[in-house]
Amino acid sequence: MCSDLIPRGVDYTKFRDAIIKWYREFGEKDLPWRKAGDPWAVLVAALLLRKTTVKQVVDIYREFLRRYPSPARLADASVEEIKAIIQPLGMEHVRATLLKKLSEELVRRFNGQIPCDRDALKSLPGVGDYAASEVLLTACGKPEPLLDRNMIRVIERVFGIKSKKRRPHTDRELWNFARSLVPRDPELAKEFNFGVLDFARKVCTAKSPKCSLCPLANNVCVFYQKRERV
């Protein structure tokens, strides 16, 4: 169990507070899907962002929602029409087919509404735990973790833990631990999650992490403390 590997006496509050403070100063607060209150807009972003970059997605995301502001509108579109919009992202046939199926399922099963329930969301085509968490956190006001490889890297380094799963994002213990870190307040939960993701991309990078810029290095991060002792 991941929780058995966590050092005793760790103050999660310091971690949360440091990440939120960092996000308020350095985070990407203007990304449109982070400000979206519409579950459909958040779900679209989650699917468009797969295997591509934020920079590539922003303009396409805005145009996509302008044309298809609801699942019902997208369900009426053809795969070819959808492909024409998202072609610059690559894998356009796969993405378009998936988005079409998703919209049809939402119309058929949920009357065109996006459910604020994890199991219901995960029953939809192309929606896994991460996409479900994005909708629940950003649009439904639920304090869920956005546990992707970036958050996993930060958590494993800071707390000195390591998932035993070959695919850590499927590790239930890791999900439960990540969930315990998220503030209960919905707005703070967003700042914390977005902060961890931006922090992972800008500071706690996969290669050559910028520990000199890390507010967690000296008094929280196990990875840094071990490296300094070498």
From Swiss-Prot:
Metal-binding in keyword set: yes
Signal peptide per UniProt: none
EC numbers, comma separated: 3.2.2.-, 3.2.2.29
Keywords assigned: DNA damage, DNA repair, Glycosidase, Hydrolase, Iron, Iron-sulfur, Metal-binding
Cofactor(s) required for function per UniProt: [4Fe-4S] cluster
Any one of the GO BP annotations: base-excision repair
Reaction catalysed by this enzyme: Hydrolyzes mismatched double-stranded DNA and polynucleotides, releasing free thymine
Gene Ontology terms for molecular function: 4 iron, 4 sulfur cluster binding; G/T mismatch-specific thymine-DNA glycosylase activity; metal ion binding
Co-factor binding comment: Binds 1 [4Fe-4S] cluster. The cluster has a structural role.
Gene3D superfamilies, per the entry: Helix-hairpin-Helix base-excision DNA repair enzymes (C-terminal), Hypothetical protein, domain 2
Family membership: Belongs to the Nth/MutY family.
Function: DNA glycosylase that excises thymine from T/G mismatches and uracil from U/G mismatches. Can also process T/GO and U/GO, but not A/G, T/C and U/C. Has weak AP lyase activity.
Protein name in UniProt: Thymine/uracil-DNA glycosylase
Organism for this UniProt entry: Pyrobaculum aerophilum (strain ATCC 51768 / DSM 7523 / JCM 9630 / CIP 104966 / NBRC 100827 / IM2)
